[in-house]
Amino acid sequence: MIVGHGIDIEELASIESAVTRHEGFAKRVLTAQEMERFTSLKGRRQIEYLAGRWSAKEAFSKAMGTGISKLGFQDLEVLNNERGAPYFSQAPFSGKIWLSISHTDQFVTASVILEENHES
């Protein structure tokens, strides 16, 4: 049973601006493992990665119905599986979490669906 659905969209330019204006912005949003991946990337790909994680975490908080103010960015971690698909490796939810992140030249969007585990 689906218990929550959250969607977020961000302009890449606004994330890039936040990185430029606020030293430590990436460290506030990303966990240590996410930060490792972030620092291995260069240029525009770095901004896309950070924006994708930001958007995924915002979408998760909306699916939970709490907003990001009730969750910390460090409470949520998005990694990639062996095929490159993003998944929540850390999140305060015991059921199934469905995550999709997409980019264009200007925007990033994320969708999160929370599904309760039901055993028959």
UniProtKB/Swiss-Prot annotation:
Cofactors that this protein relies on: Mg(2+)
GO-annotated cellular components: cytosol
MF GO annotations: holo-[acyl-carrier-protein] synthase activity; magnesium ion binding
Catalyzed chemical reaction(s): apo-[ACP] + CoA = holo-[ACP] + adenosine 3',5'-bisphosphate + H(+)
UniProt-listed GO biological process terms: fatty acid biosynthetic process; lysine biosynthetic process via aminoadipic acid
Record key words, sorted: Cytoplasm, Fatty acid biosynthesis, Fatty acid metabolism, Lipid biosynthesis, Lipid metabolism, Magnesium, Metal-binding, Transferase
Entry's localization field: Cytoplasm
Principal subcellular localisation of the protein: cytoplasm
Enzyme Commission numbers on file: 2.7.8.7
Superkingdom, natural source: Bacteria
Positions bound to Mg(2+): D8, E58
Function: Transfers the 4'-phosphopantetheine moiety from coenzyme A to a Ser of acyl-carrier-protein.
Family (UniProt): Belongs to the P-Pant transferase superfamily. AcpS family.
Subunit details: Homotrimer.
HAMAP family in the record: AcpS
Protein name: Holo-[acyl-carrier-protein] synthase
